[in-house]
Amino acid sequence: MATKQPNSEEDFDSEFERKPMVDWFAPAQLFDSGMKVVLSNIFGVHADKREMQAALQQGSCFDYSSCQDDNGEFWLDYIADIGEGWNSTYSMAYLLAQEQLFFKDKDSGETKYLLIQEQLSELSDSGEKKKYLLTQEQLSELSDSGEKKEDFTKIKRGKILIMGGDEVYPTPTREEYRNRLIGPYQAALPSVKEAAVCPPVKEATACPPVKEAAHSSVKEKELPLPHLFTIPGNHDWYDGLTSFLRLFCQGHKIGGWQTRQNRSYFALKLPHNWWLWGIDIQFDSDLDKPQRDFFSEIAEKQMKKGDKVILCTAKPEWVFCALTKDSKCYDNLVRFEKEIICPNGVLVLTLSGDLHHYCRYETDKGTQQKITAGGGGAFLHATHNMPKKLLLDACGEENASEKPALDASAEENAVQKKVTYSRAKVFPEMKTSKRLALGAFLLPLKNWKFALFVGLFYQLYAWILLQGYAIMNGEKTLMAIIHGKLAVELVFTKFGLALLYGPAEVFTLLIVFGLWFFGKWKWKLDGLLHGIAHVLLNILLIWFLVYLNFSESALVLKNQEMLRVLLFFVEMIVVGGFLGSLLVGVYLVICSFLKINLNEAFACQSIPDYKNFLRLHIDKAGQLTVYPIGVKTVCKKWKWNPKAKEGESWFEPDDSRGTLPHLIEGSLQIKLPNN
């Protein structure tokens, strides 16, 4: 049944709130995120609902091997790290919803145009811009060239949409899922015009027939396409997976996409002996036994020798093991690959999100690809810290760099069973990523709540230091210090005594060693220097503001002592907040060039642009091709479509600078080991 369109944009806004990007540096958000991480790490393992799912529900295995279109082709879409700000999330949902996209490549391989089918047919002699997707210059150039739709590569909407983790931010509440995910996707594809239905599942195929679901009177085999499958990321796990299971595992529809799974992991049999597996790694933990048993049974009893596997996991552990020098989590993934996939199958492609950019690694032979495509709507992550080479365990002897030598030691053979992955492509480009990192300089302007918090902390620290200065130097009151002459040469002498005052000492240690604890560069020196810089800045601000307000040459509020004291503390909040948060921004920029704390350097900016998703295609010969689609600038203005037909989006782009997608690196044909 088609979702009824609201009568007006106002009616839509009364049902869904179009959320902005999350202010990750807002004090309340920082506290909430920190508590979520701590509580999840403490209780997450003890509240593992994956085993409960196995006890209550049959495993989610579905057969799409006979679901090709009339040309014998099969399409599916992949997107990850999705529901944050409306503009970025809806921009990607809008593109996913289009029935067909058209590309044309130049000789250089760069994308020249990306058009929606209706726009190609609506080009007029006047060159009028249709649906606001194309610029005037592009329309004129296309009209003058006389090119036709046949000159473009046609990219169809997937019959399946895979959401690869972190479907909502910052927390997986019912309200956040509704506003940040359901609203944008329902508006983008409220229904599907003339929806196709998969052929009945055959008894003899790999996956057994799916029984009638307890929550629905409609048999699974009769559910219209497209279908939706999801795996949870760490943000989906913050409530123990409660909201995720309610939304994605009970047969609900999200716009025109129909959910089917009943667990947080699934297996899909695709045409031409391709499989897609989606695994649930919880919080970087090992796979639970019921999940391993589920995939083991499929691999042993349902897969044929040589079947090709696309593996979807919520986190690119292959990257993190290189960045953090900790391979524990990646070892869990490798063990799953070696013990379950590789005995019968061939792992060809691994997809992940978690890092909010596009980054592809491939082996020297090109027979294994690992792609991070976390550009579904969340704030941008850096790319210039991505390692150039990765040395990883091989899944299957055919992928190892060398065969084990008979006379070699165990350690030598272990090294020989490694395979090198090279960084093939990133989006945004590394030079762009470095430039965007400089935006952290604007932290006090982009995050006024954080600046206010820093200012209040500076004011409190200043008051404690002045009290300590008074007591340690024999003064009775704070006013005695205010009336005294604080010369520059006294700042580092008598204030040194103030730092020995109990409360001042506690606060100083809290600042210095608190920031040292979060340091990441060479014995955490970056954090230590950062903390010392804040202490020195606060002392210098005290001297400057006292001199400005209470020196003999002060021009403000003479004979108004209490008002001048009040003014001093207000100035400390405002000036200290600005300079203190600016110091944090400077620290993050410096760290970005040291390739540390990059998550914070980009989180403080909440950049909505440089988004991406993948469109996968299996042709009639069984060749898998990946189309990585990127958007440099998401649309910021939208126009309500009051007369949207069935299958049409409720909001259309109204921003010539936004929603202009392109192929990030052209079409990527996946090579097989024996080809």
Where do the PLM segments sit?
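A short, polar/proline- and glycine-enriched secondary-structure boundary/capping micro-motif
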Residues: L287-P290, H381-T383, C635-N641
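Membrane-proximal envelope and lipid/glycan-remodeling enzymes
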Residues: K308-I310, F320-K325, R335-F336, Q369-I371, ...
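Acidic, histidine-bearing metal-coordination/catalytic regions of metal-dependent phosphoesterases
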Residues: M1-I162, V168-P232, D236-Y238, T242-H272, ...
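Active-site-proximal beta-strand elements of phosphoester/diester hydrolases
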Residues: E73-E84, N273-F283, I310-A314, Q368-G376, ...
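Conserved beta-sheet core of the metallophosphoesterase superfamily
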Residues: T230, D326-A394, G580-K611
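Active-site neighborhood of phospho(di)ester-bond hydrolases with catalytic His/Asp-centered motifs
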Residues: I79-A80, K159-D166, H227-N234, I279, ...
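Active-site environment of divalent metal-dependent phosphoester hydrolases
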Residues: G85-N87, Y169-P172, H235-L241, D284-L287, ...
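Active-site-proximal segments of metal-dependent phosphoesterases and phosphodiesterases across multiple
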Residues: F283-D293, Q302-V348, P444, K449
